[in-house]
């Protein structure tokens, strides 16, 4: 019974660790610019190995990036806007 309870506590934490959202950057520190969401989904999933991506404020915003990927530093308001848009 204790093992089962421990499993229920640890499982959600494992899903959260290692994933983040943001503007993934290349080796030069720049996020890809965009006008279409399809381009960003391909860029995020195939180049940066994210779960998905879309165009948010003329740059590719990736959802579900690995923790070791570098992302562009953005304001909290921009991050909330892009996170909210991708969820809805």
From Swiss-Prot:
InterPro entries for the chain: LCN-type_CS_alpha_beta_dom, Scorpion_toxin-like, Scorpion_toxin-like_sf, Scorpion_toxinL/defensin
Coiled-coil region(s): none
Source superkingdom: Eukaryota
Subcellular location: Secreted
Gene3D superfamilies, A to Z: Knottin, scorpion toxin-like
Function: Excitatory insect toxins induce a spastic paralysis. They bind voltage-independently at site-4 of sodium channels (Nav) and shift the voltage of activation toward more negative potentials thereby affecting sodium channel activation and promoting spontaneous and repetitive firing.
Protein name per its UniProtKB record: Beta-insect excitatory toxin LqhIT1a
Organism: Leiurus hebraeus
